[in-house]
Amino acid sequence: ILAFVPWINGEGLVSKFVPFAFITGGFYSCLAGFIGMRIATSSNARTANAASESLNRGLRVAISSGSVMGFTVVGLGILDVSVWFLILKYVFQCDSTTIANTMVMFGMGASCAALFARVGGGIFTKAADVGADLVGKVEAGIPEDDPRNPATIADNVGDNVGDVAGMGADLYESYCGSILASAALGAAA
């Protein structure tokens, strides 16, 4: 609701595209994290299977799976920045200052989503890790990350959310943020 307040009175304090840019930035940042999490979960079994044949083959599968995430982040970043620029420049004929201000808010949306994904993932990871350690080591007397401990699944999910989804959203935000910072400097000059 607060995103729409600056232009409710009609004075046009900010561009009317700012709330939508913020929302799409957050959406694409979350999408990058989600795609990274899906890639990581599907490639773990393939990497383990390939590593059972040879270490070289396992390494190739792991590196190619990781590069998919990198290309996804770059592709989503270029797609969203390009679409916003083309729409604002050629459909609505906005000036460069309005385009830069709107697209900086797109970067703020991506940054907000990345922050929540990283912090939320870190909290979930630590809570699952502590729970698995308490149940496994203290109560049952089994070693850490033992497959007999069912809390290990929650620990692995927490690692996936914190380290993969949070990192994907963070990389997307950093990539788009660097592009949009240079665009803002170019518009201000």
Mark where each language-model region is:
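Hydrophobic, small-residue-rich transmembrane alpha-helices and their short perimembrane loops
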Residues: 1-189
